[in-house]
From Swiss-Prot:
Function: One of the primary rRNA binding proteins, it binds specifically to the 5'-end of 16S ribosomal RNA.
Quaternary structure (record): Part of the 30S ribosomal subunit.
Name of the protein this chain belongs to: Small ribosomal subunit protein uS17
Family affiliation: Belongs to the universal ribosomal protein uS17 family.
GO CC annotation, single: cytosolic small ribosomal subunit
GO molecular function: rRNA binding; structural constituent of ribosome
Lineage: Bacteria, Pseudomonadati, Thermodesulfobacteriota, Desulfuromonadia, Geobacterales
Keyword annotations of the record: Ribonucleoprotein, Ribosomal protein, RNA-binding, rRNA-binding
One of the Pfam families matching this protein, by short name: Ribosomal_S17
Species: Geotalea daltonii (strain DSM 22248 / JCM 15807 / FRC-32) (Geobacter daltonii)
Length: 85
């Protein structure tokens, strides 16, 4: 994989698994407000390809950037870090 370049990775929580071979992953990040110097939580939702339909809602997953697979899907689930109990 190193010869193709570094791909972006994100860690997030699965919020929806209702689509076939697709999950919606919510990724949280902290940004610092420029005026008030307070940290604010921002989140983004990404649609990710799940080949085996193995991810369930609440799972913590690692997603990696990949080629566009559809209009909205540009990420792929690499591994499930933590299962939802």
């Amino acid at each position: 994989m190193s010869e193709r370049g570094n791909r972006k990775t994100q860690i997030g929580v699965v919020v929806s698994d209702k689509m076939d071979k697709t999950v919606v992953v919510k990724v949280d990040r902290l940004i610092k407000h420029s005026v008030y110097n307070k940290y604010i939580k921002r989140s983004a939702k990404y649609k990710a390809h799940d080949v085996d339909n193995s991810c369930k809602t609440g799972d913590r997953v690692l997603i990696v950037e990949t080629r566009p697979m559809s209009k909205d899907k540009r990420w792929k689930v690499r591994q499930i870090i933590e299962r939802n109990a």
